[in-house]
Structures are given as C-alpha cells and as structure tokens.
Amino acid sequence: MVEDEKDQELFTGTKDVVDTHKFDEAKLITWMEANVEGYEGPLTVRQFKGGQSNPTYQLITPYKQYVMRRKPPGKLLPSAHAVDREFRVISALYPLGYPVAKPYSLCEDTDVIGTIFYVMDMLEGGILWDGTLPGMEPSERHAIYEAKVKTFADLHNVDWRAAGLEGLVKKVITLRARYIGGRNNMLLQKLSKFQIWTH
C-alpha cells in the first residue's frame, strides 16, 4: 500500500525513458508496422513510473495508445521476468471476455529492442492506493468489493486446459517449489499435492 501522497506521485504517470532502458525506437516502429494490427505512427515512447520488475512503456500514436512490457536488459535468471508467460495468459483470457487488455503480439527476437517484449492495448483506469477505500460512500465500496470478488471468481472458473494453459500451471508450481526448497516444508507439501492435481 502506498499511503503518502508524495510516494503516490512517484508511482503515477510516465517519465522519459531512463538511459538503462532505452532502445532503438526505429526498430520497434518497423516491428509494430509488421506485427500490430492497425498501427499507424508517428510513435512517442514514454516509460511508466514506479517499481515494475519488467520495464513498462506507454506507446503513443495520434490514433491509439499501447503498452509494451519487456524483459529488463542484462543477465537474468532463466525463469525470471517471463513476459512471454504473461502474454500467453493474457492471450488465453482475452477471447473469453475476461477483463484484460487486448494483446497484439509477442516478439522473441532480441535483435529488435534487445530483449523479449509484447504489446497490448492501453486501458485507462484508476489506482486504488488504499484497500479500505477511504473517502468513498459505503455503496461505492460495496460495488467495488463485489466486482473484485466476481472478477476473481470468474478467473477461478476458467477451464485452464480448454484455454490452452495446460503445462503452464505445472511449470509455475514447479518453479515455485524449487524456489521455496527446504525453507517451508508445510508449503512445499501443499505445492506437491497441487503438482499432482495438474497432471
């Protein structure tokens, strides 16, 4: 939770792309022309503020706005920063009418901007900094909490095998189990049971 208004400002909006996250914008434009349906330039690139483990950019054109998520540059752990996994999940949920941004394309060619990335629609929305929703009427809070519960319930009702996510669940659990190791035996036992269920 970000409580201080000054802290909120640090996490809100966009900024110029920081030097360590810059890339060849001309190559990105060429890729978008070939891979993003309906794309028309010119393109302006901004970077979202805040602490994302994967650098996130706002791609602005006169006609539409997009969001790009990429792996950070540098040496990474093999299973870390899996934006390709993000794209796979979003691509599976979007056709079902689940409230995620429309995904356009995943680029696994690191010659384009240096790392794997994907592009999706930019959706406007508010940020609920405090989960207690201060300043709202009880009826407003009720509506938001109810919508949140329904959205999570809808997600849990997705047939993940039919959605093409089979194998992904098992992989994620295996990675988590490996990460936990012997540090939490009770949690590791629960994950082991879950691994059996995903077979």
Predicted feature residues:
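Juxta-kinase regulatory segment immediately upstream of eukaryotic protein kinase catalytic domains
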Residues: 2-39, 43
